Amino acid sequence: MATLKEKLITHIASESTIPNNKVTVVGVGQVGMACAVSILGKSLCDELALVDVLEDKLKGEMMDLQHGSLFLQTHKIVADKDYAVTANSKIVVVTAGVRQQEGESRLNLVQRNVNVFKFIIPQIIKYSPDCIILVVSNPVDILTYVTWKLSGLPKHRVIGSGCNLDSARFRYLMSEKLGIHPSSCHGWILGEHGDSSVAVWSGVNVAGVSLQELNPAMGTDRDSEKWKEVHKQVVESAYEVIKLKGYTNWAIGFSVADLLETMMKNLNRVQPVSTMVKGMYGIENEVFLSLPCVLSASGLTSVINQKLKDDEVAQLRSSADTLWSIQKDLKDL
């Protein structure tokens, strides 16, 4: 006897079993879930996979998202601790990793994350050999290098979320100072995501008007308007949010969805993300730093040759040296 479903539906052709635009998020902590929700909110994938080692938390997050399916345009939301669930992903977002313990050195933290990534990355490649990996876990520049080494992928398919968020914070703070929407305030934060990032004051503009031409002291200690404080706030803002609420997640989630939109829709937008910079600006080691990069469906296809001043280049090189001093001592890569 025919079932209700058979009475209701007449099949014409078999359904496609391989997703067109699948995204995986590895790690369902605060950052991973903010990324997942931001990606769903922008309707960027037809299938979203979540992976974590915490099975109950993972299942709970999956069910919670599935219950909102009516309000989303994502056909399928799946989750499992087995990486088979990630098969055929176009982009894999890695947010997993261990947290820094009190008094722990960065090298020790990075080494512990290397050990985590040694399990994660080969599993990703096994099931999605053609994917692009977007690394979000901190310290992001070093872990992007680690991912590149462990994955064997070409460098254009291993990208760090880098200074996309730092630049967004910069443009927001600039917009507050000027009373103009952040999208009309143009400025770039490059280099290391975090403490040694570089503000490119020479390129800061509104409608093509260079702010440094209007205020030649901008970004220096001589500046009576103290614009240098804006960059200082960018660097300190994450620490402040962590102090207030315990972690940061929403802004990085929006930032990641923004990067995914550029790649999933093949937009060729220029965004400050972490890429391999050996051979650029006199940097001699294999380090990943943020530069203005063109992102497309192929990954990171080009780097914009930004005209940097001597002091900005010196800061970039200093960042590179800092990162290399940690990377060169990493084991098992």
From Swiss-Prot:
The organism's superkingdom is given as Eukaryota
Q: Whom does it interact with, and what assembly results?
A: Homotetramer.
Chief subcellular location: cytoplasm
- Which HAMAP family would you find in this protein's record? Lactate_dehydrog
Biological source species: Caiman crocodilus apaporiensis
Quick one: which pathway? Fermentation; pyruvate fermentation to lactate; (S)-lactate from pyruvate: step 1/1
Key words, A-Z:
Cytoplasm, NAD, Oxidoreductase
Name of the protein in its database record: L-lactate dehydrogenase B chain
- Read off the lineage from the record: Eukaryota, Metazoa, Chordata, Craniata, Vertebrata
- Which residues are responsible for catalysis? H193 (proton acceptor)
Under the heading Pfam families, the entry gives:
Ldh_1_C (PF02866), Ldh_1_N (PF00056)
Q: Where does this one sit in the cell?
A: Cytoplasm
CDD domains on file: LDH_1
Q: Which reaction does it catalyse?
A: (S)-lactate + NAD(+) = pyruvate + NADH + H(+)
Q: Which cysteines are joined by disulfide bonds?
A: none
